[in-house]
Amino acid sequence: MLAWLHASKGQGTEPFGPLGAEPPQQSIGMNDASASQQIDAILRKTTGWRGERLGQLRALIRGADPGVIEEVKWKKPSRPEGVPVWSRDGIVCVGEVLKNAVRLTFPKGAQLKDPKGLFNTRLDSKTVRAIDFHEGEAINAAALKALIVQGARLNRS
């Protein structure tokens, strides 16, 4: 529960998640595993192209900045395994498996320069930007790594 109430370093004390939302219930069984092991389990559970894509994105994120750490947040009954999160002095990006896409959400994405136009959703938000990856689409690894590095730098500034 403390993870829900604890804000990222250098940020306020507002909880993560929807405003006014109650802290999600913790999943029994995965709490003892490290975040990396929990993400491994999420990848094993996510079959087909979406699991493969999330694994590819994870590798790119980890390779972009060795200081980025893995976390799992927002466990709740409808998603007991939680959501993969990559942080460095605050959240850099969040990975979500959707019905027809794998989404990387950047909580401070509106502040990032995106010269290659990777952001393709949440474009109306004043703070958040996201990228939906669909089956068969290529990943622009260099541009994605640049966004990861920018996001981590922004958190440290």
Residue ranges: model-predicted function:
Residues 5-6, 16-157:
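Charge-dense, helix-prone N-terminal extensions
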Residues 2-12:
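Extreme N-terminal basic, low-complexity initiation segments
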